[in-house]
C-alpha cells in the first residue's frame, strides 16, 4: 500500500511540475511571423552591421511584461544546439536577448559565413506555442 501511495505521490509531483511548466508557455496566433528586415539572406556585410527585426501578427513588450500576443526578440548567432521550447532561452554569445523590446541592434562578427535566426520569447524569455521563429539566414562578413 505504501508503495502505491509513493508512486501516486511521485506521479502527482511530476504532473504538477509539468502543468506548471506548461502554464509559463504563452500562446501565439497561428499567423504570427518574425523575420529579418535587414540584412537579407545571402547579404555581404561589414564586420559591424545593423540587424533590424520584423514582426507580424503580434506586438512587442519588454521582458517581465505579461501581455497577450506579445513578446520580445532573441537573436541566435551560429547556433547549432537544441532549444528547450518550454524553458527560458539561455543567455550566451550565441543567444542574444533583447528584453527591453528592441527591434534592431548592431553586432560585430568575425570575417566569414554566419547563420542568424530570430526567436520571439514571452515575458519570461520562453518561446511561444506555436513557436514564432524566423527562417535561418546566412550573411557573409567581409
Report the location of each language-model feature.
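Short coil-to-beta strand junction motifs in C2/discoidin
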Residues: 65-73, 133
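Bacterial N-terminal signal peptides that target proteins for export
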Residues: 1-8
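Internal, hydrophobic beta-strand segments that form the core of beta-sheet-rich folds
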Residues: 110-124, 133-137
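Short amphipathic, basic-aromatic surface patches that mediate peripheral association
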Residues: 54-64
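Short, well-structured beta-strand segments within conserved domains
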Residues: 49-53, 103, 112-120
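Short, compositionally biased P/S/T/A/G/V-rich stretches that sit at domain boundaries
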Residues: 23-46
Amino acid at each position: 500500500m505504501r508503495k502505491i501511495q509513493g508512486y501516486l505521490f511521485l506521479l502527482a509531483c511530476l504532473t504538477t511540475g509539468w502543468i506548471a511548466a506548461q502554464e509559463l508557455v504563452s500562446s501565439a496566433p497561428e499567423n504570427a511571423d518574425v523575420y529579418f528586415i535587414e540584412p537579407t539572406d545571402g547579404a555581404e556585410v561589414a564586420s559591424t552591421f545593423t540587424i533590424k527585426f520584423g514582426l507580424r501578427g503580434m506586438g512587442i513588450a519588454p521582458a517581465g511584461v505579461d501581455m497577450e500576443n506579445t513578446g520580445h526578440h532573441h537573436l541566435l548567432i551560429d547556433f547549432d544546439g537544441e532549444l528547450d521550447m518550454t524553458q527560458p532561452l539561455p543567455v550566451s554569445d550565441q543567444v542574444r536577448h533583447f528584453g527591453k523590446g528592441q527591434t534592431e541592434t548592431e553586432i560585430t562578427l568575425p570575417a566569414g559565413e554566419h547563420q542568424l535566426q530570430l526567436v520571439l520569447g514571452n515575458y519570461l524569455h520562453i518561446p511561444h506555442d506555436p513557436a514564432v521563429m524566423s527562417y535561418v539566414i546566412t550573411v557573409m562578413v567581409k
